[in-house]
């Protein structure tokens, strides 16, 4: 009985990963990319402002 739950979780985990690789993961990746770009632009902006000052 103890050996069954890990196997079931493993199978469900693989299925969830496969689903996330599809349409479900696209918004997450897009949001992460947008946040990364915004943070990069913000850090660049702060650096430029400091240099000008």
Swiss-Prot record:
Signal peptide: none
Tissue spec. comment: Expressed in the spleen, pancreas, peripheral blood lymphocytes and at low levels in the epigonal organ.
Keyword list, A-Z: Adaptive immunity, Immunity, Immunoglobulin, Membrane, Transmembrane, Transmembrane helix
Transmembrane segments: 29-49
Acidic residues bias (residue ranges): 13-24
Compartment(s) where it occurs, according to its Swiss-Prot or TrEMBL record: Membrane
Region (Disordered): 1-25
Keyword field contains Transmembrane helix: yes
Organism from which the protein derives: Ginglymostoma cirratum (Nurse shark)
Disulphide bridges, residue numbers: none
Membrane topology note: Multi-pass membrane protein
Any Gene Ontology biological process: adaptive immune response
Protein name: IgW transmembrane form Tm1T3/Tm6T3/Tm3C4
GO cellular component: a single term: membrane
